[in-house]
Amino acid sequence: MKFSEAWLRTWVDPDISRETLVERLTLAGLEVESTEPVAAPFKGVKAARIVAVEPHPSAPRLQVCQVDIGSGSLLTVVCGAPNARAGLWAPLAIIGAQLPAGIRIELAKLQGVESFGMLCSAAELGLAEQSAGLLELPEGDFPGVDLHEFLQFDDISIEVDLTPNRSDCLSVAGIAREVGVLTQSPVTEPAIEPVTAQIGDIFPVTVTAPAACPRYLGRVLRGVNPQTQTPWWLRERLRRSGIRSLGLVVDVTNYVMLELGQPMHAFDLERLKGGIQVRYGQADEALTLLDGTHLRLDEETLIIADQQRALALAGIMGGEESGINNQTRHLFLESAFFNPSVIAGRARFYGLHTDSSHRFERGVDPELPRRAMERATALLLEIAGGQAGPVIEVADSSQLPPQATIILRKARIHRVLGVEIAESRITEQLTRLGLKVERIEEGWEVKVPSFRFDLALEVDLIEELGRLYGYDRLPSTRPVGQIQPVLKTEAGAFIDRIRQVLVDRDYQEAITYSFVDQELQQLLDPEGSPLVLNNPISTDMAVMRTTLWTGLVQALQYNSYRQQERIRFFEYGLTFNGQLADLKQERTIAGLISGASYPEQWGLVGRPADFFDLKGDVEAILSLVGEQRNCFEFMAASHPALHPGQSAQILREGQAVGWLGALHPWLESKLDLSSRAYLFSLQLEAVERGSLPVFQSLSKFPAIRRDIAFLVNANIPVQVVFDCLKGCESDILKEFQLFDVYTGKGIDPDKKSLALKLILQHPSYTLTDDRVNIFIERVMALLVTELGAIIRE
């Protein structure tokens, strides 16, 4: 919400400085995001009156103006603006003036005529991006007044960053109400009286969706002068609030929206057919908006229509075919209350965000439409003339938001805030906020006004009191109570162990959104069944994640673009598959590595991370299940998002529980990644089912190492060799490990040489050579029989 300090002070004018006002707003929860001067710095510019205008003797596009700045004599100024005319008040930069663009005004001779200054446009003063002629000023009492004083440029624009629940402050009226409470200052509202109907013209209104639009007001205005310029004061208040002037009618509706908080819309009455209908759209119904956007509507979009076509997106933006222009003389004014739940998300669904939708989706006071209608009508008739018809109102009170009644207990206030607030002050502050307060035995019975959608519970009122008392003034009191140890479930403790394992391996935990980009997720998990959100935060957060990889890959992109060369992320969270009726939520642990295998150091030659680095990290997680680690195996398999030659499926007792591998090269190219990325994903439930450790005393007898080298077919995975060894049941085989793989010279092309290290040890006695040799011969025979191995000497 952006507004000018001067406008606010016409409503409430506390005796505090500008800096204090900004600070008080921020401390009260209305965070001031920025303040800026309402005009660019310039000096030497006066409010001047053009007395006479004559054609330039030798330049047909120029005029010679005689200008009065109250100095006793007229100044000759050469000007090329088309709107320069006698009687016009305009800004004059005198000799020596400094303009915002760094321009210094000097005595100049234009086509033989000396010019003693420059008449200025709004653009030349930094008040607009572009302008076609001189800035036309309101008539003053005396020419020659400094323009800063003449136009009250000693002002600032204040922009407040409001939280979504404070829609009541999306207006000058709402901000003024807050300032009045904070400073105990009176609030002076403009007098808004009902406008008496001068004509009997009405335009029928039908509301077929009362739950979506419980209140709709319309009014016919005839004979409005379309050539009337928006008054300077109104244009300036809009500009200082960040809104461009777009013509009188639009300016007035925007002004009322900023002043009172009620978005309005004006239709060209002569372009409407039959009557207004407030209804839901029809499938594939067409609508062209005021900004030229062509839409195909759906059946969940609330629209304003006539008997022939859709006219506007309700609460969002009007349509081109019914919009007003500089020839419009007859208007139909709309002022309505739309249910926030109906408007929320529709603007984003169509890729739109307007001041109107911003307010309606947060909640507009349902009692405000009539007041806004009268205010807009009065302004239009006062400025542009015309005649107003009666107000037509269609309302369903049963569909309006109920006004909550809350019991506020004094003891509860003290217990939550830790400070005693005088009863009289509580009553005064709540009343100033617009709440109806009645004293009862235990505290107060408070009736919430229609404009406060955020007040529903007792704690909401206590929060208001704390906010107005001042969060900075609340005492800091340590809680007193018994400290109880936090009891974690086995599942909670297990994920903490996984976290610790990964952190020890130099990973960082990431927490990403559960809402993800549908296109990216389709690339990473094309077989998933994502749940599409009806009301997405944005178009790139439109579906629920079916895999954690989507968020991790986006995090990789973000960090890569910021020159992070070594990235190791993991995330624990839920994935969502299916639709609402059969939605499957699954706890998942996933990780991603990219860049160097280990941090740069002097003692090791750097190398990029590879598939086996990631596999080692996954094996470290699987080792947490104890003896049941042997239930897991890695099988080469194909995944659409992974490199076809560097991907594996993780199985537990034959059932798929996860994936790991390198990101597909095509995806790396599409995502513009600078280095190869490796990912894993694992169902947490699969690794939670482990066995408790069983104590085994260490053998005091020596361990013996034996190495076996053999040839097998090149297409046999090492995992098959390991499975073969696991089948060799023995009480002396403590450990086996692959320590060499060789292909090339001296080996048949269809073979590979593997070398295994076997560690043998018995818990009760020293192994003899005979016992060891018998076991080794048994292992070699098993390899030959099961795998067709050729033992190497």
From Swiss-Prot:
It catalyses: tRNA(Phe) + L-phenylalanine + ATP = L-phenylalanyl-tRNA(Phe) + AMP + diphosphate + H(+). Residues 699-792 form the FDX-ACB domain. Binds 2 magnesium ions per tetramer. It is an enzyme of class 6 (ligase). Mg(2+) binds at D454, D460, E463, E464. GO terms for molecular function: ATP binding; magnesium ion binding; phenylalanine-tRNA ligase activity; tRNA binding. InterPro entries: aa-tRNA-synth_II/BPL/LPL, B3/B4_tRNA-bd, DNA-bd_dom_put_sf, Fdx_antiC-bd, Fdx_antiC-bd_sf, NA-bd_OB-fold, Phe-tRNA-ligase_IIc_bsu, Phe-tRNA-ligase_IIc_bsu_bact. GO terms for biological process: phenylalanyl-tRNA aminoacylation. CDD domains: PheRS_beta_core, tRNA_bind_bactPheRS. It comes from the Bacteria. Its EC number is 6.1.1.20. Residues 39-148 form the tRNA-binding domain. GO terms for cellular component: phenylalanine-tRNA ligase complex. Residues 401-476 form the B5 domain. It holds the Pfam family B5. Belongs to the phenylalanyl-tRNA synthetase beta subunit family. Type 1 subfamily. Tetramer of two alpha and two beta subunits. This is Phenylalanine--tRNA ligase beta subunit. It comes from Nitrosococcus oceani (strain ATCC 19707 / BCRC 17464 / JCM 30415 / NCIMB 11848 / C-107).
